[in-house]
């Protein structure tokens, strides 16, 4: 599906061909601006006359294609036995402050506010 979307981008925007895509189609990969410049995860892209493009004269802007929000969304929901779980992001210098998440709420799935990992209580 991603290859089809990329091919259709080259054909043009708003044409008869692009209307045939399903409504829930999602693009994967790095987005590019109309000038061909890569767009970062924050949507940063410079105009042609912007003085900040001086940094990239003679070379391409390097953009990490693995956005953290996409990598976290791919993680499965962790099943735990208790109704309160603590998340420290992996511990040590690579983690975040420990937070406690209640899993007996209406949502039934708890999400860590720091790292985005999701937890669900496994009922016996």
Swiss-Prot record:
Q: Which UniProt keywords apply?
A: Electron transport, Membrane, Mitochondrion, Mitochondrion inner membrane, Respiratory chain, Transit peptide, Transport
Primary location group: mitochondrion
Per UniProt, the transit peptide runs over 1-28
Q: Which Pfam families match?
A: zf-CHCC
Q: Where in the cell is it found?
A: Mitochondrion inner membrane
Which superkingdom is the protein from?
Eukaryota
Q: Which GO terms describe its cellular component?
A: mitochondrial inner membrane; mitochondrion; respiratory chain complex I
InterPro entries the record matches: NDUFS6, Znf_CHCC
**According to Swiss-Prot or TrEMBL, what is its membrane topology?**
Peripheral membrane protein
**Might you name a Gene Ontology BP term for this protein?**
mitochondrial electron transport, NADH to ubiquinone
Say yes or no: keyword Oxidoreductase present: no
Please state which protein family the record places this protein in: Belongs to the complex I NDUFS6 subunit family.
Question: What does the UniProt record say this protein does?
Answer: Accessory subunit of the mitochondrial membrane respiratory chain NADH dehydrogenase (Complex I), that is believed not to be involved in catalysis. Complex I functions in the transfer of electrons from NADH to the respiratory chain. The immediate electron acceptor for the enzyme is believed to be ubiquinone.
Spell out the subunit comment. Mammalian complex I is composed of 45 different subunits. This is a component of the iron-sulfur (IP) fragment of the enzyme.
Q: What is this protein called?
A: NADH dehydrogenase [ubiquinone] iron-sulfur protein 6, mitochondrial
Species of the source = Bos taurus
Name of the gene: NDUFS6
């Amino acid at each position: 599906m991603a290859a089809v979307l990329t091919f259709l981008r080259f054909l043009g925007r708003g044409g008869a061909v692009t209307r045939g895509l399903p409504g829930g189609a999602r693009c994967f990969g790095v987005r590019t601006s109309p000038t061909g410049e890569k767009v970062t995860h924050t949507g940063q892209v410079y105009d042609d006359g912007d003085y900040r493009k001086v940094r990239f004269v003679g070379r391409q802007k390097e953009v990490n294609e693995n956005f953290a929000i996409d990598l976290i969304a791919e993680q499965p929901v962790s099943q735990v036995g208790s109704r309160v779980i603590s998340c420290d992001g992996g511990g040590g210098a690579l983690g975040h402050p420990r937070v406690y998440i209640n899993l007996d709420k209406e949502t039934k799935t708890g999400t860590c506010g720091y790292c985005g990992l999701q937890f669900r209580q496994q009922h016996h």
